[in-house]
Swiss-Prot record:
Modification sites for N-acetylalanine: 2
Gene from which the chain derives: Cacybp
The protein's name: Calcyclin-binding protein
Assembly information from the UniProt record: Component of some large E3 complex at least composed of UBE2D1, SIAH1, CACYBP/SIP, SKP1, APC and TBL1X. Interacts directly with SIAH1, SIAH2 and SKP1. Interacts with protein of the S100 family S100A1, S100A6, S100B, S100P and S100A12 in a calcium-dependent manner.
Sequence segments annotated as region (Interaction with SIAH1): 2-81
GO BP term (any one): heart development
Lineage: Eukaryota, Metazoa, Chordata, Craniata, Vertebrata
Organism of provenance: Rattus norvegicus (Rat)
Amino acid sequence: MASALEELQKDLEEVKVLLEKSTRKRLRDTLTNEKSKIETELRNKMQQKSQKKPEFDNEKPAAVVAPLTTGYTVKISNYGWDQSDKFVKIYITLTGVHQVPAENVQVHFTERSFDLLVKNLNGKNYSMIVNNLLKPISVESSSKKVKTDTVIILCRKKAENTRWDYLTQVEKECKEKEKPSYDTEADPSEGLMNVLKKIYEDGDDDMKRTINKAWVESREKQAREDTEF
């Protein structure tokens, strides 16, 4: 039952993360319904566990373990990272984390993700889920370290001596979308014209007048230069 509760809790946390990031109404409605179903199932299983009695009257009941608080989990969004030839290292600052029991700091790795859960730190739980890592990692060789007020997640690179420019594939795609696209075989002036055209379309009246004036002056200068030859 304990493993089922843990799996439901992980499902709930992931749905919450997706819900926070989603903007489409249809997707949000679907995720909201799924969140309600998981919360209901989680409550039912916790009630079943608390009501379960020993099979024999003379059997001592097992020690009651406080369930993971479901109502107050803090999403970790601030972190830093760097890399070596073998590892990508993620640094998360959590005041007092070195004082909680070691089993309260859990990290689950897959080839392209990791899931950090810190239980009962100053009465709160802390969660960080990172999916779609830029490149594959070795699950068996990845690990964590707990230092003073800091958790360090060590993702072992599957391909050593390779550089990660970004932590996740999503971050890479977002950054590349921000870069202007250049066609090396195209006329350089055509790229400039496309940029000016976009500025003109998005600009206000003053901007459009400025671009028109610059365009006319440029054409007049070109015409004068042509007549000199």
